[in-house]
């Protein structure tokens, strides 16, 4: 006489396989999304590839990430990285020559932002 297997024993491997698949999917989703986190939610991390950092801390493009009220940083993509930064002057360049010439005349060419 063969021993009778209960339904519980037969279901255990199937439940374990489903549980393993769910855990692996969660780990994979966290790893993929973890690289795309930004801003305050990710300790100030910046988005790659000129993406905007949305208000919920995810990188993306379009109004949902870059629009007014939807963006927390890099709202203009890569253009934010250079806005307000002075470009270095090469010796002999027009910019370097103009700056040294103005300085010799007592003029200050420091750029400022804001209104009058």
UniProtKB/Swiss-Prot annotation:
Disulfide bonds join 38-53, 47-59, 50-78, 52-66, 71-75. The keyword DNA-binding does not apply. Residues 80-116 form a propeptide. One of its GO terms (biological process) is killing of cells of another organism. Keywords: Antibiotic, Antimicrobial, Chitin-binding, Disulfide bond, Fungicide, Plant defense, Signal. Residues 1-34 form the signal peptide. Residues 89-116 are annotated as: Disordered. It comes from the Eukaryota. SUPFAM superfamilies: Plant lectins/antimicrobial peptides (SSF57016). Gene3D superfamilies: Endochitinase-like. Residues 93-105 have a biased composition (Low complexity). Residues 35-77 form the Chitin-binding type-1 domain. One of its GO terms (molecular function) is chitin binding. This is Antimicrobial peptide 1b.
């Amino acid at each position: 006489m063969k021993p009778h297997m209960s339904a519980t024993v037969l279901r255990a491997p199937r439940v374990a396989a489903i549980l393993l698949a769910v855990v692996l999917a969660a780990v994979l989703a966290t790893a993929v999304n973890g690289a795309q986190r930004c801003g305050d939610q990710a300790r100030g991390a910046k988005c790659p590839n000129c993406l905007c950092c949305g208000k919920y801390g995810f990188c993306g493009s379009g109004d949902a990430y870059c629009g007014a009220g939807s963006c927390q940083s890099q709202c203009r993509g890569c253009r934010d990285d250079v806005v307000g930064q002075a470009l270095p002057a090469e010796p002999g360049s027009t910019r370097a020559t103009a700056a040294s010439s103005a300085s010799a005349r007592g003029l200050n060419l420091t750029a400022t932002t804001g209104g009058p």
